[in-house]
């Protein structure tokens, strides 16, 4: 029976970054890893409604830097930055070194696999039909500019007695192409019938520049303003047509 390798794990160092960037002595490695897990668990619970996608942990000498990627930065920052200052103090207590928190805003949450999986899981918990939730997620992601998406749900779908797996795919999802920018995430929906697993793969295009392009992304180009027919322009055109009709009548 064929199995799929983790789409992000196989691309680490090729077109994907690690979620933790630090070096440690063999004696300190277990301690650092445990604190990283504690930080991620703490932030996941505390920022449950902030649509957090990724947490990057870095350890410069004698300090720590935590970068939170979220679609709702206002919830993390709080009024006048009070919440983020409190968050920094709590992370400092957990990690044992001064911690700095920075926010990375996600402009298009429909292209983020974790946020899409969270949205599907949330709908399943609210008793939305799983096919409708899957189709809605696929449509929104493709409309946002994705090259392809695959969504898979498994469990007691619709309250059935026998668990099964169903999936839906649109566009291309090339899992064997290492330069392909594949975002992957899993989530669990706790329903009254049991746990339903959600998996999402999103293909956002190819990264031809490798890790250099990932570490130093090019600035987004400004979109040209749309030319719409304004009220005055439309009136002017109608006026010209009316003048031509009047000339023919004469």
Curated annotation (Swiss-Prot):
HAMAP family: Ribosomal_uS3_B. InterPro entries: KH_dom, KH_dom-like_a/b, KH_dom_type_2, KH_sf_prok-type, Ribosomal_S3_C_sf, Ribosomal_uS3_bac-typ, Ribosomal_uS3_C, Ribosomal_uS3_CS. Binds the lower part of the 30S subunit head. Binds mRNA in the 70S ribosome, positioning it for translation. The lineage of its organism: Bacteria, Pseudomonadati, Pseudomonadota, Gammaproteobacteria, Moraxellales. It comes from the Bacteria. This is Small ribosomal subunit protein uS3. It comes from Acinetobacter baumannii (strain ATCC 17978 / DSM 105126 / CIP 53.77 / LMG 1025 / NCDC KC755 / 5377). GO terms for biological process: translation. Residues 220-250 have a biased composition (Basic and acidic residues). Keywords: Ribonucleoprotein, Ribosomal protein, RNA-binding, rRNA-binding. One of its GO terms (cellular component) is cytosolic small ribosomal subunit.
């Amino acid at each position: 029976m064929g199995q799929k390798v983790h789409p992000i794990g196989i691309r680490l160092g090729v077109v994907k970054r690690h979620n933790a960037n630090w070096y440690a002595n063999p004696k300190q490695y277990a301690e650092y890893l445990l604190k990283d897990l504690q930080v991620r668990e703490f932030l996941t619970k505390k920022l449950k409604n902030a649509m957090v996608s990724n947490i990057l942990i870095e350890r410069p000498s004698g300090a720590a830097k935590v970068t939170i990627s979220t679609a709702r930065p206002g919830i993390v920052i709080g009024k006048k930055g009070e919440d983020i200052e409190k968050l920094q103090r709590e992370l400092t207590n957990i990690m044992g070194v001064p911690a700095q928190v920075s926010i990375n805003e996600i402009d298009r949450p429909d292209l983020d696999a974790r946020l899409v999986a969270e949205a599907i899981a949330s709908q399943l918990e609210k008793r939305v039909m799983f096919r409708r939730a899957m189709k809605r997620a696929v449509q929104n992601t493709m409309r946002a500019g994705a090259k392809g998406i695959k969504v898979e749900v498994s469990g007691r779908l619709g309250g059935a007695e026998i668990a099964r797996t169903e999936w839906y795919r649109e566009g291309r999802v090339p899992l064997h192409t290492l330069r392909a920018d594949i975002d992957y995430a899993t989530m669990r929906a706790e329903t009254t019938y049991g746990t339903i697993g959600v998996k999402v793969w999103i293909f956002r295009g190819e990264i031809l520049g490798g890790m250099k392009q990932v570490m130093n992304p090019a600035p987004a180009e400004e979109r040209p303003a749309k030319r719409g027919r304004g009220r005055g322009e439309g009136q002017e055109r109608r006026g010209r047509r009316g003048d031509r009709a009047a000339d023919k009548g004469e």
